Swiss-Prot record:
GO terms for molecular function: D-lactate dehydrogenase activity; NAD binding. SUPFAM superfamilies: Formate/glycerate dehydrogenase catalytic domain-like, NAD(P)-binding Rossmann-fold domains. Pfam families: 2-Hacid_dh, 2-Hacid_dh_C. Disulfide bonds: none annotated. Also active on D-glycerate. Its EC number is 1.1.1.28. PANTHER family: 2-HYDROXYACID DEHYDROGENASE HOMOLOG 1-RELATED. The active site is at R235, E264, H296. Homodimer. InterPro entries: D-isomer_2_OHA_DH_cat_dom, D-isomer_DH_CS, D-isomer_DH_CS1, D-isomer_DH_NAD-bd, NAD(P)-bd_dom_sf. It comes from the Bacteria. Keywords: NAD, Oxidoreductase. This is D-lactate dehydrogenase. The lineage of its organism: Bacteria, Bacillati, Bacillota, Bacilli, Lactobacillales.
Length: 332
């Protein structure tokens, strides 16, 4: 039994080593580069491929992988929106993901970043760097006085709800697929417009779909309270970045915490020190004191990376042995 793992980072290697010790019957090859047409031939002779990347898995790459005899693909992440689904179906590829590598990791950072915005931490850091120790005018707000609107109440959204409640905030939610327990608590509103109108903070925890592309746009911002806070810890395509800039300029949005950006692949997880970033929209957001950007690191904890490696590799092994996996993704 042989599995090849692509895009293996140095910080993932200890967790792969642990998995290999626990599964001595599996031969594993670790490749640091992303899966591309140039290196897909390395998969020849392997039973499965374990992968992670934001870059698209194109039809060409998937077809070549299938041509090499690899039909079992385990993703070390949640999202499957970068897979060429028609090719997956046509070639009969088995796909698995890691649906819950650490909801708490993402939820915790979303609340942490919001607290920085509410407590004016970026502004005080800027003043302290200049030895300005005055308080005014950067007075803070308390989360316990606010209503938080959670869009998407799955595993991550639910973890965020629990933390927000712990701070004493009122929480309302919206989801096409409602959680029965939350519904009993009367937490849901019926429409996004209701959530926009009531929430002081809006946090996104939904997958990227065609139906929610740029769901936060000029129209959505216009329906929000003045001075709302926006948290995007889901997918970059959920927000129209140019419309967000306009909302920040007008004061409709008081601040934003973003762990993702729709054109992030050219920027995030790269060392660009001393280089010019040509994306003017990104730089506009990046240079604002009331916008906090973290480069897709909400998941990045020891617990999460362990789970990403172990769950994905276990699923690949299940595919090889049985043709099915606990975390198999079905494309209807």
């Amino acid at each position: 039994m042989k599995i090849i793992a692509y895009a293996v980072r140095d910080d993932e290697r200890p967790f792969f080593d642990t998995w290999m010790k626990e599964n001595p019957d599996v031969e594993v090859k670790l490749v640091p580069e992303l899966l591309t047409e140039d290196n897909v031939d390395l998969a020849k002779g392997f039973d499965g491929a374990d992968v992670y990347q934001q870059k698209d898995y194109t039809a060409e790459v998937l077809n070549k992988l299938a041509d090499e005899g690899v039909k079992n693909i385990s993703l070390r992440n949640v999202g499957v929106d970068n897979l060429d689904v028609p090719t997956v179906k046509a070639r009969g590829l088995n796909i698995s993901n890691v649906p819950a590598y650490s909801p708490n990791a993402i939820a915790e950072l979303s609340v942490t970043q919001l607290m920085q915005l509410l407590r004016q931490t970026p502004m005080f850091n800027k003043k302290l760097a200049k030895q300005d120790f005055r308080w005014a005018p950067d007075i803070a707000k308390e989360l316990n006085t606010m209503t938080v609107g959670v869009i998407g109440t799955g595993r991550i959204g639910r973890a965020a709800i629990d933390i927000f409640k712990g701070f004493g905030a009122k929480v309302i939610g919206y989801d096409v697929y409602r959680n029965a327990e939350l519904e009993k608590e009367g937490m849901y509103v019926d429409t996004l417009d209701e959530l926009y109108a009531q929430a002081d903070v809006i946090t996104l925890h939904v997958p990227a779909l065609k139906d929610n592309y740029h769901m936060l746009n000029a129209d959505a911002f216009s329906k929000m309270k003045d001075g709302a806070y926006i948290l995007n810890f889901a997918r970059g395509t959920l927000i129209d970045s140019e419309d967000l800039i306009k909302a920040l300029d007008s004061g409709k949005v008081a601040g934003a915490a973003l762990v993702t950006y729709e054109y992030e692949t050219k920027i995030f997880n790269k060392d660009l020190e001393g280089q010019t970033i040509d994306d003017k929209v990104f730089m506009n957001l990046f240079n604002r004191d009331n916008v906090l950007i973290t480069p897709h690191t909400a998941f990045y904890t020891e617990t999460a990376v362990h789970n990403m490696v172990h769950v994905s590799m276990n699923s690949n092994k299940q595919f090889i042995e049985t043709g099915k996996a606990d975390t198999q993704v079905k494309f209807d």
